C-alpha cells in the first residue's frame, strides 16, 4: 500500500514520462490524508469520456485511477507537473504537485461557452 505512494513521490521528483507500467498492474485501494484513492489503469473508453468531457484532448499525461476528496469523485491524472482530477461532468481540478498535499482549491476552466452567436449581425 505504501509502495504506490513511495513510487509516486519518487516520480514527482524525477519524471512521470513513460511510467504507465511501473505504477500498478492491479487495483490498489487506499485512504491517505482524508482522501480515498483507487490506483488502477482505467479502460481507454473511460479515459476518453472523462478527458474529452473536461476539454482535454492530448495524451501528455498519466492516468492514475480515481480519487474521492470531500465526497467528490474524480478520475486522477498527472499532467503539467501536477495532479489533476476530472469529474464525470467534465469539471477539472488542479489538486497539487505532491500526493501528500492534494486539495480542491483550484478549478480549471477549459470549456469554451457554447453560446450560438450567429444571430448577432454586425451593422458597422
UniProtKB/Swiss-Prot annotation:
Q: Which InterPro entries match?
A: Poxvirus_A31
Family, according to the entry, reads as follows: Belongs to the orthopoxvirus OPG159 protein family.
What protein does this entry describe?
Answer: Protein OPG159
Amino acid at each position: 500500500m505504501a509502495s504506490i505512494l513511495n513510487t509516486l513521490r519518487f516520480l514527482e521528483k524525477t519524471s512521470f514520462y513513460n511510467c504507465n507500467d511501473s505504477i500498478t498492474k492491479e487495483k490498489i485501494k487506499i485512504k491517505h490524508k482524508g482522501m480515498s484513492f483507487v490506483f488502477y489503469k482505467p479502460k481507454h473508453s473511460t479515459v476518453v469520456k472523462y478527458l474529452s468531457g473536461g476539454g482535454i484532448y492530448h495524451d501528455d499525461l498519466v492516468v492514475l485511477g480515481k480519487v474521492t476528496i470531500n465526497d467528490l469523485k474524480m478520475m486522477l491524472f498527472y499532467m503539467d507537473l501536477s495532479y489533476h482530477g476530472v469529474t464525470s461532468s467534465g469539471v477539472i481540478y488542479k489538486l497539487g504537485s505532491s500526493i501528500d498535499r492534494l486539495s480542491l482549491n483550484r478549478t480549471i476552466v477549459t470549456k469554451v461557452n457554447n453560446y450560438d452567436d450567429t444571430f448577432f449581425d454586425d451593422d458597422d
